[in-house]
């Protein structure tokens, strides 16, 4: 068996080449730490990937990020990508929810909300009564639905809160933990009792802390991507790693060795051993659990217990002139509507460069925790389903000239009730395995910004010699 000897100094093996693993490896190597990245598949990026097809620029997974995370902007700057960040078209600020038989605009302000038809009048007045909400008892892991009903009422929870979580988690509003999925809401309740009061006070504080004239905040807060899609970030990270990134390198086993770690690797039909001081497992939870099982069965069970919602992304492209460009970012469909689609992004409206020559591109989402079985259908069936739902929900009768389907059986980690307790237990169990670290979207944030921020923090901790960093 070929043996890769341990090099001098601290060295790290990063297992998994999604955005979390790539970012950790990049940060470590840019700080002078010898790090190698091992990815079992033939490409880097994990769920993140952009494809230029037939005049369309389609994302296979995540489609954008909010330009509000310093770690993401710092990573873009380090990779010389700041000039390639593109903000969404202003039209994308308008969003829609399918409720009571049609698409309805989500109001952008409290006065607009009270005057809108997004909810029946009684439900809108109930939301206004949120000013008199009571705090939850301390130490209760409350579902997003229970939190919403207490603050906003039943209708607003079933329509608005469910739609919001669907766009992020594609989850079950009755099962998701509010503290794990929307910690800012829990913080606002704790500090201000009322979410409305908290929002008003936050706006006031923001105005008082306004920057002096002539200066501008570095972070726009805008929905953003790169000029060639999110693949631009993946390609830049891959280029920064160079030969330190190995694709087709599957880690078959992991064992403790002389205060460090030994990895058994199969790469392009050859088996090899690699000895390192530290290991970062950045693979999805199920793959991480498989590697952990021989080391610590209890830890492996904790990690394996993280549920995922399957997702299918169905892109439908329409020739110029066959239908009007849709308004706004897109629409979401609450579970109570019992439709077969979670929602759709108006991709060519949000980022016009995603479709050439006046073409129109819809990116439809199917499955989630509410209908996981739909994702098991073949691509033709999923494309037909998306066409039918788009016609029923948005009135699109034109026939698409372009279709592309991406299926993710393990799509989005579900931060269900007990998730924070589970992550704390994982962290405690890792104390028994010094030099081993977990990272990825299964633990402390599912979004691109979360992954990049957590990767930077882990790299900082490793370089500083703090080996007890939480996942």
From Swiss-Prot:
Note describing how the cofactor binds: Binds 1 FAD per subunit.
GO annotation, biological process: protoporphyrinogen IX biosynthetic process
Keyword annotations from UniProtKB, A to Z: Cell membrane, Cytoplasm, FAD, Flavoprotein, Heme biosynthesis, Membrane, Oxidoreductase
Entry-linked InterPro entries: Amino_oxidase, FAD/NAD-bd_sf, Protoporphyrinogen_oxidase, Zeta_carotene_desat/Oxidored
Compartments where located: Cytoplasm; Cell membrane
Assigned EC number: 1.3.3.4
Catalysed reactions, as listed in the record: protoporphyrinogen IX + 3 O2 = protoporphyrin IX + 3 H2O2
SUPFAM superfamilies per record: FAD-linked reductases, C-terminal domain (SSF54373), FAD/NAD(P)-binding domain (SSF51905)
GO cellular component: cytoplasm; plasma membrane
Pathway assignment: Porphyrin-containing compound metabolism; protoporphyrin-IX biosynthesis; protoporphyrin-IX from protoporphyrinogen-IX: step 1/1
First-tier enzyme category under EC: oxidoreductase
Pfam families assigned: Amino_oxidase (PF01593)
One Gene Ontology molecular-function label: oxygen-dependent protoporphyrinogen oxidase activity
Principal location: cytoplasm
Activity control: Strongly inhibited by acifluorfen.
Cofactor: FAD
Residues bound to FAD: 16-21, 39-40, 47, 61-64, 251, 408, 446-448
Family of the protein in this entry: Belongs to the protoporphyrinogen/coproporphyrinogen oxidase family. Protoporphyrinogen oxidase subfamily.
Subunit and interaction comment: Monomer. Homodimer.
Function: Catalyzes the 6-electron oxidation of protoporphyrinogen-IX to form protoporphyrin-IX. Does not oxidize coproporphyrinogen III. Involved in the classical protoporphyrin-dependent (PPD) heme b biosynthesis.
Protein name: Protoporphyrinogen oxidase
Organism expressing this protein natively: Myxococcus xanthus
């Amino acid at each position: 068996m070929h043996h890769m000897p341990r090099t001098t100094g601290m060295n790290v093996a990063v297992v998994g080449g999604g955005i979390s693993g790539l970012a950790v490896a990049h940060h470590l190597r840019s700080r002078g730490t010898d790090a190698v990245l091992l990815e079992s598949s033939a490409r880097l990026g994990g769920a993140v990937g952009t494809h230029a097809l037939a005049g369309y620029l389609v994302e296979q997974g995540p489609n954008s990020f909010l330009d509000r995370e310093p770690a993401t902007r710092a990573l873009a700057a380090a990779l010389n990508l700041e000039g390639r960040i593109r903000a969404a078209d202003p039209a994308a600020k308008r969003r829609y929810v399918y409720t009571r038989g049609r698409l309805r605009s989500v109001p952008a302000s409290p006065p607009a909300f009270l005057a809108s038809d997004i909810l029946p009048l009684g439900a809108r007045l109930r939301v206004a009564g949120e000013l008199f909400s009571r705090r939850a008892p301390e130490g209760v892991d409350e579902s997003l639905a229970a939190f919403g009903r207490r603050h906003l009422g039943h209708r607003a929870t079933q329509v608005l809160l469910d739609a919001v979580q669907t766009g992020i988690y594609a989850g079950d509003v009755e099962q998701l933990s509010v503290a794990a999925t929307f910690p800012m809401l829990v913080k606002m309740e704790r500090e201000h009792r009322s979410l409305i009061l908290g929002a008003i006070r936050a706006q006031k504080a923001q105005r008082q802390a306004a920057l002096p004239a002539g200066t501008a905040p570095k972070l726009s807060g805008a929905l953003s991507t790169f000029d060639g899609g999110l693949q631009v970030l993946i390609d830049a990270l891959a280029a920064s790693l160079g030969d330190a990134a190995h694709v087709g390198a599957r880690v078959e086993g992991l064992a403790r060795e002389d205060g460090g770690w030994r990895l058994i690797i199969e790469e392009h039909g050859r088996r090899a051993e690699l000895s390192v001081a530290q290991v970062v497992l950045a693979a999805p939870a199920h793959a991480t659990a498989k590697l952990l099982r021989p080391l610590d069965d209890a830890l492996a069970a904790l990690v394996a217990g993280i549920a995922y919602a399957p997702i299918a992304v169905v892109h439908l492209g329409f020739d110029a002139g066959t239908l009007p460009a849709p308004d706004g970012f897109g629409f979401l469909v609450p579970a109570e509507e019992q439709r077969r689609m979670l929602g759709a992004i108006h991709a060519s409206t949000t980022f016009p460069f995603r479709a050439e020559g006046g073409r129109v591109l819809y990116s439809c989402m199917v499955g989630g925790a509410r209908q996981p079985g739909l994702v098991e259908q073949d691509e033709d069936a999923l494309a037909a389903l998306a066409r039918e739902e788009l016609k029923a929900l948005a009135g699109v009768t034109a026939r698409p000239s372009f279709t592309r389907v991406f299926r993710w059986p393990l799509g989005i980690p579900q931060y269900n009730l007990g998730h924070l307790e589970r992550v704390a237990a994982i962290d405690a169990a890792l104390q028994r395995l010094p030099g081993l670290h977990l990272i990825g979207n299964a633990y402390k944030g599912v979004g691109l910004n979360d992954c990049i921020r957590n990767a930077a923090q882990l790299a900082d901790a490793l370089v500083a010699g703090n080996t007890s960093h939480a996942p």
